[in-house]
């Protein structure tokens, strides 16, 4: 599977050929997680509407929820103004974080409204 050249030409990748992907829950607006993608992961996501990412540690693709059942159905994919990050607007089934929490950003609040 290959990424549409019109999309690929707009992406800015790091030295490893990767760019960041932010998953946001469609119903709440919550930022759920941040992961890495390459062209193939983005192409698979666009084709299947399943959040597909690239694991730097395992050096392989993974589909969110493939083993846990905590799937992401992708409604929208947006490219940021710099071309180095994509936003996936998803319906999250179950926990988004590998720790079992709804979002990866709900445990350590460094600053909040008083």
Curated annotation (Swiss-Prot):
User: One GO molecular-function annotation for this sequence?
Assistant: zinc ion binding
Q: Which cofactor does it need?
A: Mg(2+); Zn(2+)
Q: Which Pfam families match?
A: PRA-CH (PF01502)
Is Acyltransferase among the key words of this record? no
Q: Where's it found, cell-wise?
A: Cytoplasm
The positions annotated for binding Zn(2+) are 81, 97, 104
What Gene3D superfamilies does the record tag this protein with? Phosphoribosyl-AMP cyclohydrolase (3.10.20.810)
Q: What is the annotated quaternary arrangement, including any partners?
A: Homodimer.
What PANTHER family does UniProt report for this protein, alphabetically?
Answer: HISTIDINE BIOSYNTHESIS BIFUNCTIONAL PROTEIN, PHOSPHORIBOSYL-AMP CYCLOHYDROLASE
What is the protein's given name? Phosphoribosyl-AMP cyclohydrolase
Q: Which gene encodes it?
A: hisI
